[in-house]
């Protein structure tokens, strides 16, 4: 209440304030809906099949996996064909290698039962080795064969110690896993368990295997069609006494493809 001066004195009057809505013209940043479709980034549907977690099973056994004493063989883990049905298969020209597991047996068998001068049968003492190697740039040489154990590791006698790739081939090959057993056999035969696993990809490193796939006929999983990261397996049996080592090993390769 405020006093107002007049001729008759002071009087009081209520002074009212009416609130007013102040309107500001603000720019509108929303989408315009004028019935017109405007250009933008649209995600095209992917026609390629989804890459799935799968597993390849491979058994390595038979006459070609019988090692005479002081000998070695080389082989590889075959990968699957493109679009092969039923699974396992691969949907692209590359797969992600996750883990390789193996399990099996090795039979050590004496070749001959000759007695020594004391009339006793000598022991069969030796070293059995199985080595998993990654070939970064797979290709066959002029001979059309895989690198031998001696070419890759220097000599078979090196299996008694710490195996390493020869310096001239370190840029192409690297050792992923070594399984080794030092054996002493008094009987004519002995069965040895073989089991292990190795991780090929982890959180810090991914191992991708790629393929050439030039045409439909070449979309295979053989060594000659792999252009990056093939898995090789080397077997070696060293013994001074004549004896054979027969291996039966099953491999399970986990991959995404």
UniProtKB/Swiss-Prot annotation:
Q: Extract the ranges annotated as region (Disordered).
A: 26-47
Q: List GO BP terms, alphabetically.
A: DNA transport; transport of virus in host, cell to cell
Q: Which GO terms describe its molecular function?
A: single-stranded DNA binding; structural molecule activity
Keywords in alphabetical order, please.
DNA-binding, Host cell membrane, Host cytoplasm, Host membrane, Host nucleus, Host-virus interaction, Membrane, Transport, Viral movement protein
Subcellular location, record wording: Host nucleus; Host cytoplasm; Host cell membrane
Major localization listed first in the record, in broad terms: host cell
Quick one: where's region Interaction with Arabidopsis thaliana NSI protein? 151-188
- Specify residue ranges for compositional bias: Basic residues: 29-39
Give the similarity note: Belongs to the begomovirus nuclear shuttle protein family.
Q: Assembly and interactions?
A: Binds to single-stranded and double-stranded viral DNA. Interacts with the host nuclear shuttle interacting (NSI) protein. This interaction may allow NSP to recruit NSI monomers to the viral genome and thus regulate nuclear export of viral genome by NSP.
Q: What is this protein called?
A: Nuclear shuttle protein
- Source organism per UniProt: Tomato mottle virus (isolate Florida) (ToMoV)
Lineage of producing organism? Viruses, Monodnaviria, Shotokuvirae, Cressdnaviricota, Repensiviricetes
